[in-house]
Each structure stands twice: as structure tokens, then as C-alpha cells.
Amino acid sequence: MRRAVVLFSGGLDSTASLYWALKHYDEVIMLTINYGSQEERVTNKVAEFFSRELNVPLKIVKIDFLHEFSKIAGSKLVEGNVPEVTARELEDFEKAKETARSVWIPARNFVLIGVAASLLDALGGGDIIVGFNKEEGETFPDNTKEFVDRINSALKYATMNEVRVVAPLIELDKKGIARLLKELNAKYEYSNSCYNPQGFTEDGKPIHCGRCESCVRRHRGLIEGIGEDKTVYLVTPKV
């Protein structure tokens, strides 16, 4: 039996990865990890929605130390105002790197993969499904194929059972992810990409700020990829 744990943060990437995993594995478990980021005020509800919608078991784990370390690092994801960007600024590599640094969570993906690996090792092994993609890999080094390859090398020594990381979106940009979501009939409008979400609509859709980097990337990818965006925004991003 093929088993997978999907690291689910609630955004487009992990939502696409979740739907993909359900097509490729016999047993799928969602794992959402709370570390004190500002978007967690909606993340858990998003995870619970997809768990119910897709009938997938969900585990929510809290790790307080990562919140503490992120505050030391000055990450705007856990404290302060997240930077606002335009679509044009995203094309400026130095500006994009600067924005990435401001929301960086110290060794986040390394830590989260470790938690997922521990769960899978306890269950007898399996694959960790992550939403790493080509577009974010340009500014976040822990979203790259090189990172996945090196993590998988380490996991051979770190677990008693066979555990590996699988990144089905690694060659895709946001446009490609949008097309995959449409192909999989995913209810992406119930996912949340926003660093500073504004609550929910009456029917349970997250309200995105429309101003942060993640909102701009999301809207641009959906419009350019499938020609529509069902996401609810406080302010519609300009692309």
C-alpha cells in the first residue's frame, strides 16, 4: 500500500499537491503544522474544510519553538506588517529576494519535513508530499530540486523505514499550478495564500488582502493560467 503525508499549509501549492496525492496514493494523511504565523488564524479552518470535503484524515501539530526563533529572525510572517508588492516588483529579482528575506521562517521546510518524516517513520514509511515549485524556488532556496535531493539523501540515514520527499509541482510555475488545479477540479477558492488574511466569507471562503506578495502571485498565476480567479480579495491585485 502506498502511503503519503501531505504537508498542508492551506495555499494553492499544497492544495494542488493534496488533490494530486489522492490520485497517486492508497492512503493520504494531511499534516498541518502551526508555528505562530499570522495566517494561522485561517489555516486550520482551511485544512479542516479540505479534510471534510475530500474525506482525508488531518493531523494538526503545534511547534512553539519555531515561532520564537522566527521572532528572533525578525520574520514579518509572525510579527509586524508583511510587505506589499506589485506584479511589476515581482519581476525585479532583487526586490523579490528582499521580500523573501522579510518573511523567511528559519529553516522552516527543513523542520516541517522532519516532523512529517517522524510521523511516516512511526507509521512504517511512505512519501512526504510538498508543494515546492519552480516559481518560488527562484527566491526561496528550500523550494528547489537541489534541496529535495539533499533532504532525501539525509532521510536515508534519519529514518528506520523508507521515507522520501516527493515534489510533484517542482517544474511548475503558478500558471502551471493553476492549470493543474483546474484539471483536478480542485475547489481552490477555499484555499488561502494570503500572509495577512481578513477572515472568511459567509460561505467559508478565505478573504485575501490582495496586497502581499503571495496574493499577487496567486492572482497572476490564476488569471494567466486559466483566465479566471474565484478567490475573494479585499482589494483585487493588479497584474
Swiss-Prot record:
What's its catalytic activity?
Answer: 7-carboxy-7-deazaguanine + NH4(+) + ATP = 7-cyano-7-deazaguanine + ADP + phosphate + H2O + H(+)
Q: Summarize the protein's role.
A: Catalyzes the ATP-dependent conversion of 7-carboxy-7-deazaguanine (CDG) to 7-cyano-7-deazaguanine (preQ(0)).
Root EC class:
ligase
Which gene produces this protein? queC
TM segments?
none
| GO MF entry, a single one | ligase activity, forming carbon-nitrogen bonds
Q: Where does ATP bind?
A: 8-18
> Which key words tag this protein in UniProt?
ATP-binding, Ligase, Metal-binding, Nucleotide-binding, Zinc
Q: What is its EC number?
A: 6.3.4.20
Q: What is this protein's name?
A: 7-cyano-7-deazaguanine synthase
Pathway the protein takes part in? Purine metabolism; 7-cyano-7-deazaguanine biosynthesis
Q: Which family does it belong to?
A: Belongs to the QueC family.
CDD domains per the UniProt record, alphabetical: QueC-like
HAMAP family named in the record: QueC (MF_01633)
What domain of life is recorded for the organism? Archaea
Which of this chain's residues are annotated to bind Zn(2+)?
A: 194, 209, 212, 215
Which stretch is the leader sequence?
none
Pfam families cross-referenced by the UniProt entry: QueC
